[in-house]
Amino acid sequence: MSFVPSKVFFTKGVGRHKEYLSSFELALRDAKIEKCNLVTVSSIFPPKCERVSVEEGVKMLTPGQITFAVMARNSTNEYNRLIAASIGVAIPADDTQYGYLSEHHPFGEDAEQSGEYAEDLAATMLATTLGIEFDPNKDWDEREGIYKMSGKIINSYNITQSAEGENGMWTTVISCAVLLP
């Protein structure tokens, strides 16, 4: 049996609780995907896959459903510890080709830093498969321009959740690309 997703939605959440597992559950609830049995998968954006809104995607879910997702996840119980979870996305101009999703889950990076890093990872992985020449030592903004000017990468973006740890609590952040039939 072959399953190639035709739709994807992106979601994120944060949860806080005195128990680690409960903080993860609350992050899933915040992301609106707590009712699924999530199976994490690696980082390929399927060809011809359509992005739908969170609201539309959640309507396609059934409680208990086995649901495939690319997930970035991070947790802390340290007061004021900055955490983030980011999914980077890079989509080729040719929709018959696959793109890339990347996961990044750092400590000490805010949402902008973490998101840009994840987006850079995904775009760089895609660029290398498409034969786009670039200098990996250039900063992301310069490489992003090169990637998009090549005409081979049409879009890149990220979805990121960040938070700071609270005293006496576990804090969990997640960002997910949820893959649908």
Curated annotation (Swiss-Prot):
Example GO molecular function: arginine decarboxylase activity
EC number(s) from the headed UniProt entry: 4.1.1.19
Instruction: Provide the reaction this enzyme catalyses.
Output: L-arginine + H(+) = agmatine + CO2
GO BP term, pick one:
arginine catabolic process
Site residues by UniProt (Cleavage (non-hydrolytic)): 42-43
Required cofactor names: pyruvate
Q: Does the keyword Lyase apply?
A: yes
Keywords, ordered alphabetically: Decarboxylase, Lyase, Pyruvate
Q: Is Nucleus among the key words of this record?
A: no
What are the disulphide bonds in this sequence? none
Q: How cofactor binds (record note)? A: Binds 1 pyruvoyl group covalently per subunit.
Taxonomy, superkingdom = Bacteria
Q: Do you know which Pfam families this protein is assigned to?
A: PvlArgDC
Record PTM Pyruvic acid (Ser), positions in chain = 43
Check the record and name the Gene3D superfamilies matching this protein.
3.30.60.30, Pyruvoyl-Dependent Histidine Decarboxylase, subunit B (3.50.20.10)
**What does the sequence similarity comment in the record state about its family?**
Belongs to the PdaD family.
HAMAP family from the entry? PvlArgDC (MF_01404)
Identification of the protein by name: Probable pyruvoyl-dependent arginine decarboxylase
Question: What is the organism of origin for this protein?
Answer: Chlorobium luteolum (strain DSM 273 / BCRC 81028 / 2530)
Gene of this entry: pdaD
